[in-house]
């Protein structure tokens, strides 16, 4: 297993993308600190990791609150001795365009996506340096952070900012042997998230593809070169690779698990 003996702290552990990543890290041998503002999501994520034979704790935390983040990072150290892997995935969906979004909504959404990553990255990095750990950090982006998407101004802007944050932090922390990368998912098949929510015993409606934003096709997967949408387990495997020694010379890099979405020439319709 790639991550045997490693401790991973994962934020935003809903049953979909981040739940899949948390379970993927556990399957490669990591023990988990599962964090979400929804205590049921955090706890059921931890229980799913324990069911796989690993250790896990859950922490309910607002990632924008420095006091709560400080306490969460301290508890990870108390419980496991420290953190080896940080995955910043906490998010907030609010699908509005520039003409509809209020400044309060803008601040809250960008605060969750950017400030949350800033706080966890800063505090976990300080802990890693204090403990002499050559750790790994992964920020979860989105194809919306690479491309313009109508009706999603706060999310896309924050994800784009997080992409550059990754590169900048990678340079700041390289001298300490801490690698920092990002992982870009795209529109994701809902089946696995729904199955995981049922298995966890929690409610997760998730964004319905084709209904979330104006102009989406009925079958978004048909527009990808791979002709299908990825699932959270695909992201989990990619995150495990980035966090492993197999990626020891990779930092400041964005790994796109998007079925070729970003690389595709815009006018080509693979499904036609």
Where are these regions (language model features)?
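Residue(s) in the substrate-gating loop at a strand-loop-helix junction
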Residues: 142
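Canonical Rossmann dinucleotide-binding motif of NAD(H)/NADP(H)-dependent dehydrogenases/reductases
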Residues: 3-32
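Active-site helix of classical SDR
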Residues: 121, 158, 166
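Substrate-binding pocket helix/loop in short-chain dehydrogenase/reductase
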Residues: 97-98, 105-110, 220
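Conserved glycine-rich Rossmann-like NAD(P)H-binding loop of the short-chain dehydrogenase/reductase
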Residues: 30-45
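Short C-terminal tail/terminal secondary-structure segment
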Residues: 147, 240, 251-272
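Alpha-helical segment proximal to the catalytic Tyr-Lys
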Residues: 126, 130, 171-175, 248
């Amino acid at each position: 297993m790639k991550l045997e003996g490693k401790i991973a702290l994962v934020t935003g552990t809903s049953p979909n993308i981040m739940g899949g990543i948390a379970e993927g890290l556990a399957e490669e041998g990591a023990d988990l600190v599962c964090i979400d503002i929804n205590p049921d999501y955090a706890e059921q994520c931890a229980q799913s990791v324990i069911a796989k034979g690993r250790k896990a704790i859950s922490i309910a935390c607002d990632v924008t609150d420095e006091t709560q983040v400080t306490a969460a990072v301290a508890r990870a150290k108390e419980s496991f001795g420290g953190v080896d892997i940080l995955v910043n995935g906490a998010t907030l969906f609010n699908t509005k365009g520039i003409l509809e979004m209020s400044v309060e909504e803008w601040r809250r959404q960008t605060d969750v996506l950017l400030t949350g990553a800033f706080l966890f990255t800063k505090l976990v990095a300080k802990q890693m340096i204090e403990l002499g750990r050559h750790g790994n950090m992964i920020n979860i982006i989105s194809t919306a952070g690479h491309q313009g998407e109508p009706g999603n101004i706060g999310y896309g802007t924050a994800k784009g900012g997080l992409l550059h944050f990754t590169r900048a932090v990678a340079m700041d922390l390289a001298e300490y042997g801490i690698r920092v990368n990002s992982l870009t998912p795209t529109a994701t098949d809902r089946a696995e998230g729904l199955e995981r929510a049922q298995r966890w015993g929690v409610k997760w409606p998730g964004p319905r593809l084709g209904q979330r934003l104006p102009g989406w096709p009925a079958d978004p997967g048909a527009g990808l070169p791979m002709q299908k949408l990825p699932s959270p387990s695909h992201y989990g495997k990619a995150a495990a690779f980035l966090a492993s020694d197999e990626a020891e010379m990779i930092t400041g890099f964005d790994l796109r698990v998007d079925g070729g979405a970003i690389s595709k020439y815009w006018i080509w319709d693979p499904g036609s």
